[in-house]
């Protein structure tokens, strides 16, 4: 059995995120592999995978902020807001000045309401939006709040009657960079779509920690053990042996260190935090609720605490 942990993969273009999971299932010889945060097939870059019990924490990673390098083509709008769709509108964009582009980019920073791209995995009445679009159905997705902490122009260059804009983006989870490209083009009156996308960071995990799939095939290895990952991502709380046993049973709300049924007191730590046994191993992820705690994920059940895994 593979040890539990996270693998930071540099996803190549042309593969779906599920393709990467399938490849890593073969590399690590386990079916228990999942990913945090889908990348479109045309995109490259950071894809965080969980192996074995580390799949339990992937849902918490999907909410992490993300960073991207991207190229936006101004002067063409497409059916998918990226280069994989059909061109539905072309406008000569050669008149655009760098000042006009910078001003439009600035208008898309901060807290905004973004309409996701219709060709997306968002569910509408139980079906993925992209499937409805393929069936010829009209799809209207509601705008939702996202935060764009950085949207910076790195380079501008002519591409025929279009203008290609290289940008860097730091954004909240749930942001569609394709939609940013669309909205930038709309703000400038010329249309726009995404021609390249590379994710450079997911939360604490960046390209500097990422492995290529060929590297992993030659030498399967984790980027972080499950304990290392939990302590990197979350705050830490040290438990007594009795508290650790209770947390391992999922009884954090009634973790009686002395068998008296009292709830485990709040730690005063914001958000989810890692609860550690006296030997330093992570037992569970907890969250304060008022004066008490709630178990979010049991990392190491009580039945495993006598072992070394």
Swiss-Prot record:
Catalytic activity: uridine(55) in tRNA = pseudouridine(55) in tRNA
Any one Gene Ontology molecular-function term assigned to this protein's record: tRNA pseudouridine(55) synthase activity
Top-level EC class as recorded in UniProt: isomerase
UniProt keyword Transferase present: no
GO biological process: mRNA pseudouridine synthesis; tRNA pseudouridine synthesis
Family to which the UniProt record says this protein belongs: Belongs to the pseudouridine synthase TruB family. Type 1 subfamily.
HAMAP family in the record: TruB_bact (MF_01080)
Protein's name according to its UniProt entry: tRNA pseudouridine synthase B
């Amino acid at each position: 059995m593979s040890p539990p942990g996270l693998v930071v993969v540099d996803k190549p273009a042309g593969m779906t995120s599920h393709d990467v999971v399938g490849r890593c299932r073969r590399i690590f010889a386990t079916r228990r592999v999942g990913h945090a945060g889908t990348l479109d097939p045309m995109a490259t870059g950071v894809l965080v995978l969980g192996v074995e019990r580390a799949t339990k924490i992937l849902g918490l990673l999907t909410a992490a902020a993300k960073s991207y390098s991207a190229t936006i083509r101004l002067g063409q709008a497409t059916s998918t807001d990226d280069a994989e769709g059909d061109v539905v509108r072309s406008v000569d964009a050669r008149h655009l000045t760098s000042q006009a582009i910078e001003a439009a980019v600035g208008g898309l920073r901060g807290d905004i309401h973004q309409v996701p791209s219709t060709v997306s995995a968002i569910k509408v009445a139980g079906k993925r939006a992209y499937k409805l679009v393929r069936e010829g159905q009209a799809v209207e997705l509601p705008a939702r709040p996202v935060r764009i902490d950085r949207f910076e122009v790195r380079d501008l260059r002519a591409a025929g009657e279009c203008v290609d804009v290289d940008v860097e983006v730091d954004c909240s989870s749930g942001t569609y960079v394709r939609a940013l490209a669309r909205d930038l083009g709309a703000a400038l009156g010329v249309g726009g779509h995404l021609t390249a996308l590379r994710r450079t960071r997911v939360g604490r995990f960046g390209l500097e920690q990422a492995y290529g799939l060929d590297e992993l095939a030659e030498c399967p290895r984790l980027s972080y053990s499950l304990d290392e990952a939990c302590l990197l991502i979350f705050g830490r709380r040290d438990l007594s042996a009795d508290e650790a046993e209770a947390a391992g049973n999922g009884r954090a709300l009634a973790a009686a260190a002395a068998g008296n049924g009292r709830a485990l007191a709040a730690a005063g730590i914001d958000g989810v935090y890692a609860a550690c046994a006296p030997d330093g191993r992570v037992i569970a992820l907890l969250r304060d609720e008022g004066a008490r705690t709630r178990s979010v994920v049991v990392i190491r059940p009580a039945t495993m605490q006598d072992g070394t895994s």
